[in-house]
């Protein structure tokens, strides 16, 4: 039976609502965020592919884009994302985060308290050509992808990759395509993303589920568990 997405909303700062679609599977949550001036459709079929592979995909519009509230503002991407990750994490546990372009580069500087368990940057594009300050988040596993046929974009992606902590993996393919188009042109990369999520996100999600279940059991009184005849 195919999985169909449903509309979803996440409230961030000052009651502002980010809207998009969610694939309601029982798997680990993965948040997708498009780049500036794009929309939900920019991901092509990545959201559906990940959902088919068992992940609860949450594909959201940025502030001021598409269905979301507010005015588009590049300066709020970091704070909005920190707020939405906090909301999602409180409900669904450890999170995977996937972005591309300028947004992917910006999100490498998320506050450690709101950091995802897995972060995937597809062709991240920082606004500078200078080395970036290091991002030390030992609890986050990073996957950075780039098409090496575009030398400039590959160098930019490398700047981001080099700024990250030790738990990271670089994946590249000989292609001029970048961002979601890179995945569309080389679909085996979606398989690589899936394997990375299964390796680093799924175990954390299962541990979270077990802890939550153990807590429910410990809080259940004998009277709660008594079966009435």
Regions found by a protein language model. Give the residues of each.
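The serine-hydrolase catalytic nucleophile loop
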Residues: 36-47, 156
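N-terminal cap/lid segment of alpha/beta-hydrolase-fold proteins
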Residues: 1-23
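Primarily recognizes the serine-hydrolase "nucleophile elbow" in alpha/beta-hydrolase
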Residues: 86-138
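Conserved alpha/beta-hydrolase
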Residues: 50-69
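Alpha/beta-hydrolase active-site loop
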Residues: 71-90
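Catalytic histidine neighborhood in serine/cysteine hydrolases
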Residues: 164-181
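Short beta-strand/loop motif that positions the catalytic acidic residue
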Residues: 138-139, 144-146
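Short alpha-helix in the alpha/beta-hydrolase fold that links the catalytic acid
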Residues: 153-163
């Amino acid at each position: 039976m195919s999985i169909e997405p449903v509309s979803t909303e996440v409230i961030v700062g000052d009651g502002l609502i980010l809207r998009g679609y969610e694939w309601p599977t029982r798997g680990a949550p993965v948040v997708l965020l498009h780049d500036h001036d794009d929309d939900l459709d920019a991901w092509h079929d990545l959201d559906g592919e990940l959902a088919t592979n068992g992940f609860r995909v949450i594909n959201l519009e940025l502030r001021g884009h598409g269905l979301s509230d507010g005015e588009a503002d590049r300066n709020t991407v970091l704070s909005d994302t920190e707020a939405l990750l906090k909301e999602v994490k409180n409900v669904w546990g450890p999170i995977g985060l996937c972005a591309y372009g300028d947004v992917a580069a910006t999100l490498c500087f998320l506050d450690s308290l709101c950091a995802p368990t897995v972060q995937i940057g597809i062709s991240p594009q920082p606004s500078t050509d200078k080395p970036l300050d290091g991002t030390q988040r030992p609890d986050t596993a990073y996957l950075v992808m780039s098409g090496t046929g575009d030398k400039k974009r590959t160098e930019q992606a490398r700047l981001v990759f080099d700024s990250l902590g030790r738990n990271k993996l670089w994946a590249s393919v000989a292609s001029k395509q970048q961002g979601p188009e890179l995945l569309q042109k080389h679909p085996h990369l979606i398989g690589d993303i899936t394997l990375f999520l299964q390796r680093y996100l799924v175990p954390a999600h299962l541990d979270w589920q077990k802890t939550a279940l153990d807590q429910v059991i410990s809080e259940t009184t004998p009277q709660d568990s008594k079966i009435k005849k």
